[in-house]
Amino acid sequence: WFIGIDGSFAPWVGSVINDINQKIAIICPEGREEEVVKRLARVGYDNTVGYLKGSFSTWKKEGREVGVVIQETAPELAEKHSKTQNILDVRKPGEFAAEHIENAQNQPLDDVFNSLKELDTEKRYHVHCAGGYRSVIFISILKSKGYNKLIDVKGGYQALRREDIPKTDFTCQTTQKEGG
């Protein structure tokens, strides 16, 4: 799975890697290996088995299989948007409740393994979060489980909200009452 070092790394490691004893191999930019090991250890993940010397470029040079995440821009999605498209919003429920694309499904990243039960491996899904970090993690996990028709929406909801695409009305979550 891919969890980017330059985002909210530690919280997402804790959310998506359920087994604290999981063996972890690191692929990161050269020179940042020690940083990743320390950041993993700070949140209790001490089972790092090693790192790929030379980073991702070594993997590619050796001709090993590389997974890719297909991206579309928000304008590209808006241009072809229809109510029949499958749009997955992987933001937290409160973010989704505040405002979202009409007919989007909320499948929060921190609940990704339950999403496996609800999604069809044969369907194409456009996936977004707020800005693009969480959606790539979500996609990398699903791709490892056989979901290959996933498209990341570049720029996430921040980019989508500027497009002429049907959205729910904004509701400030700090003023919304429990149960209402």
Feature map (PLM): residue ranges:
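Rhodanese-like catalytic fold shared by cysteine-dependent sulfurtransferases
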Residues: 1-180
